[in-house]
Every structure is written in C-alpha cells, then in structure tokens.
C-alpha cells in the first residue's frame, strides 16, 4: 500500500535536493560549453582538474553524510542544541582538513595526477593558477556540502534549492563568462566564477544555520514524527 502522506514527505525532501543537483549540472554543462570555445587544451584541463576536485570532495561528502545522520537523530529526539553544536563542530573539522587537502593535493600532487592523463606542458601551465583558486573554493564547498545536507535532515529543503538557482545562475555563470570571455582570462575566469558561487552560498548557508532559521522546520519535523510515533504506539497497545 502506498501512503500519499509518506510519498508527499519523501518528495518534499527529495525533489528540492534533486532540483539543486539538476541546477548544478545544468550550470556546469553550460560553462563547459563556454570552456569549449577556449580550445581543446582548456577542455582537457577542465576534465582532468574536475577529477582532481573529486578526490577532495570524497572527504567533504563523508563528513557531510555522517553529520546529516547525527543531526537527524538529535532533531528526532528534539535535542536542537546538540544538533547545532554537532553541525558547527563538523564544519570546523571540515574546513581544517579540506584546507589541508586543497593545498596539498593540487599544489604538491597536482603534477603527478595530471601526468597520469597527459604530458602536455600547456595543460600543466593552464591548470597551475586554478590550483590556487581551489584552495579558497573548496572551503566554500565544504560549507555547502555539510550544511545543506544537515538542512535537509531537519526538513529545511527549499531554501538551499532557491539559493542554488540564484547563486549558480546569478553569480557563477555571469562572473565566469565575464572573466573568461570579456576579460580574456579563459579557463581561470570560469573557475573563479565557480569559486564565487561556492563561497557565496557557503557564507549564506552558514549564516542561515547560525541565525537558527532552520529551527521552525526542525520543530515541524519533530512534531510530525512525534504524532506518527504516538499513533503507532497507541495502535500496538490496542
């Protein structure tokens, strides 16, 4: 039996998250088409560098998933103070380790990773300045990944999606196109646009969490689950 209320709750959390991911993919696809106008070397650098970013993101995703589970447990027990402290603690850990990884992997291991895919010196030269941009970008990205996952855990799902649409298409794309095309910075300009988006959303998400704007959603989430649990317990006792 499919319960409409359960499906509604699933979609209320899942659809905004899917919308956010769709927005990111569309933005990245559009900017990749822009990179294509810079030539084959820029496209090759973009592809290889994106794989390197994936190595750094593995740590961010693991911290975010663990934090999401712990935060949801605290909210389910109506321990909002513990949920808040856990999130802030995870953010501190994430920023420190991501900063270390984003410095060491691109700056120290970047040549080794790139040499696996290519020996073209033009690719190395084009990627080098992007390494420095990634140090700042990954700090913003860790804020997004950890906090957005935790906001979903407490039922605050629409705000991250709306901010993703506004920031990606209102910051990342315009800045990337302006710097990359108009200022002739090429691939570096595009990645500065990505960096501006990640940092903008990261600061906004951190502000939303610290101002407790997520608490009303957490309270609604708790009340809804409390009522379900109460009905289930009552049904068992009959």
Which stretches of residues belong to each language-model region?
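Transmembrane alpha-helix boundary and packing residues in multipass membrane permease domains
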Residues: 17, 21, 29, 33, ...
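Hydrophobic faces of transmembrane alpha-helices in multi-pass small-molecule transporters and flippases
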Residues: 2-30, 34, 55, 59, ...
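Hydrophobic alpha-helical transmembrane segments in multi-pass membrane proteins
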Residues: 17-32, 61, 93-106, 137-141, ...
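Short alpha-helical transmembrane segments in multi-pass integral membrane proteins
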Residues: 1-14, 71-137, 180-238
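Helix-terminus/linker motif at the lipid-water interface of multi-pass membrane proteins
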Residues: 22-55, 73, 78, 113-121, ...
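Interfacial/gating helices of multi-pass transporter permease domains
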Residues: 6-13, 17, 33-54, 122-129, ...
């Amino acid at each position: 039996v499919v319960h409409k209320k359960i499906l509604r709750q699933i979609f209320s959390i899942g659809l905004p998250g899917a919308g956010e991911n769709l927005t990111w993919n569309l933005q990245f696809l559009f900017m990749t088409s822009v990179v294509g106008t810079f030539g084959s070397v820029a496209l090759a650098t973009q592809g290889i560098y994106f794989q390197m970013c994936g190595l750094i993101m593995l740590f961010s995703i693991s911290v975010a998933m663990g934090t999401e589970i712990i935060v949801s447990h605290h909210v389910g027990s109506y321990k909002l103070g513990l949920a808040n402290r856990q999130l802030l603690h995870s953010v501190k850990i994430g920023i420190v380790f991501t900063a270390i990884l984003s410095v060491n992997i691109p700056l120290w291991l970047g040549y080794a990773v790139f040499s696996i895919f290519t020996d073209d010196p033009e690719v190395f030269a084009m990627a080098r300045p992007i390494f420095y941009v990634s140090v700042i970008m990954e700090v913003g990205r860790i804020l997004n990944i950890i906090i957005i996952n935790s906001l979903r855990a407490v039922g605050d799902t629409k705000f991250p999606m709306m901010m993703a649409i506004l920031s990606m298409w209102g910051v990342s794309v315009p800045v990337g196109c302006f710097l990359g095309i108009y200022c002739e910075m090429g691939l570096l300009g595009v990645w500065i646009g990505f960096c501006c988006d990640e940092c903008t959303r990261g600061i906004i998400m951190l502000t939303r969490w610290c101002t407790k704007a997520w608490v009303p959603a957490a309270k609604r989430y708790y009340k809804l689950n409390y009522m379900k649990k109460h009905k289930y317990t009552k049904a068992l006792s009959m």
